[in-house]
Amino acid sequence: MTKATFAAGCFWSVELLFQRVAGVTKTRVGYTNGTVENPTYRQVCSGKTGCAEAVELEYDPEKVTYNQLLGLFWSKHDPTTLNRQGNDVGTQYRSGIYYHNEEQKNEAIASKEKEQLKYKDPISTEILPAGVFYPAETEHQQYLGNY
């Protein structure tokens, strides 16, 4: 299995999107690329941790490619809005692709360049190495999938 990590607003709906993909074998929501170890949801929502709400997933590259996952990521949100998706506002809702290897990095950069052609405004999505991923509290895991 291969890991991928994406941030595209509230992690509940992002997780649900990827849970429905054939070839994705595991998802978990959490916090990444911040400055606080083991942050809580409340701390992340304060905007003082630097963390993004993100989804870390495991997938079978024989069944779904990283490029296909990137396509879903881009389709899920407006990557031109900085630190905002819909009514959710704050740095924790930023758009991000957090790569786990050089191949993912290169594919992410290429997909961002291709995606930019669709927009007048610049894409604000950050592409960074995957940092430490802190799983969110149990009540946030598979939140929308449970309803």
UniProtKB/Swiss-Prot annotation:
Residues 1-23 form the signal peptide. The keyword Oxidoreductase applies. InterPro entries: Met_Sox_Rdtase_MsrA_dom (IPR002569), Met_Sox_Rdtase_MsrA_sf (IPR036509), MsrA_MetSO_reductase (IPR050162). The keyword Oxidoreductase applies. GO terms for cellular component: cytoplasm. It catalyses: L-methionyl-[protein] + [thioredoxin]-disulfide + H2O = L-methionyl-(S)-S-oxide-[protein] + [thioredoxin]-dithiol; [thioredoxin]-disulfide + L-methionine + H2O = L-methionine (S)-S-oxide + [thioredoxin]-dithiol. Pfam families: PMSR. It is an enzyme of class 1 (oxidoreductase). Its EC number is 1.8.4.11. Keywords: Oxidoreductase, Signal. GO terms for molecular function: L-methionine-(S)-S-oxide reductase activity; peptide-methionine (S)-S-oxide reductase activity. One of its GO terms (biological process) is cellular response to oxidative stress. Belongs to the MsrA Met sulfoxide reductase family. This is Peptide methionine sulfoxide reductase. It comes from Dictyostelium discoideum (Social amoeba).
